[in-house]
Amino acid sequence: MTFWNEIYAHFDPVAFSIFGLKVHWYGLMYVLALLVALYMAKFFVKKDRLKFSNQVLENYFIWVEIGVILGARFGYILIYSNAQIFYLTHPWEIFNPFYNGKFVGISGMSYHGAVIGFIIATILFCRKKRQNLWSLLDLCALSIPLGYFFGRIGNFLNQELFGRITDVSWGILVNGELRHPSQLYEACLEGITIFLILYFYRKYKKFDGELICVYVILYAIFRFLTEFLREADVQIGYFSFGLSLGQILSVFMLILGFSAYIKLLKNSQTEQKFNQNKS
């Protein structure tokens, strides 16, 4: 066994403590992910001369953060948790970071739920602030991937969302068994790779909303593939054809992404023809 294989034995998921409260690396990575996403948004606004002010972006990120947290938490409870009745009768426990008097943080977040919360928050923000919805979503498509990268690194450091059992040399020892570091696969594919693709693809953007559609399509494909190397949630298991819930949700995302792309493309072509005839 190499140091890498046994890295969890040498690594503490708790970064430090403040007045008895344990601060986990996952929490730090989550904050870093938000800061990186905001920085990237400002970077592309300046680089591509987009019509969004810093004040608009900062206000928007507050709205989005609230939407993402609510969506991620409620999404986990509704989709992945087997304690829906408990939370329905004890709603104050949904965001309770304490257990038996000890601070343990809020565990259980769903990315697909976060996406729903993100979309709702974005729609409400654009309606209230009179912003271009699809243009803002395109900016998010460029900003999210690198933030997502740090989020998955946080999952790895927090020793959660393990991969399936493997015999590859780079496997991570978890409870006596080597497992795929699937969190790192996702960080690279759904984070770095998608960012690089969109970074260069944006130069060929033909209509507002195109980048967010491409992001959704790419994420769905990569998530579907990496799920084959990721252990399914114990309380849910696998469905028909050995597919996980994450893969099933990714199929819906893929359909949604392609459908939105086709609709927006047709709308763009119709608008171009109308403008040509008008001139």
From Swiss-Prot:
Any Gene Ontology biological process: lipoprotein biosynthetic process
The UniProt record lists the keyword Ribosomal protein: no
Sorted UniProt keywords: Cell inner membrane, Cell membrane, Membrane, Transferase, Transmembrane, Transmembrane helix
Enzyme category, top tier: transferase
Membrane-topology annotation of the record: Multi-pass membrane protein
EC identifiers of the protein: 2.5.1.145
Transmembrane segments: 25-45, 60-80, 103-123, 133-153, 181-201, 209-229, 236-256
KW DNA-binding (keyword) present: no
UniProt xrefs under InterPro entries: Lgt
Pathway(s) annotated for this protein in UniProt: Protein modification; lipoprotein biosynthesis (diacylglyceryl transfer)
Sequence similarity: Belongs to the Lgt family.
Name of the protein described by the UniProt record: Phosphatidylglycerol--prolipoprotein diacylglyceryl transferase
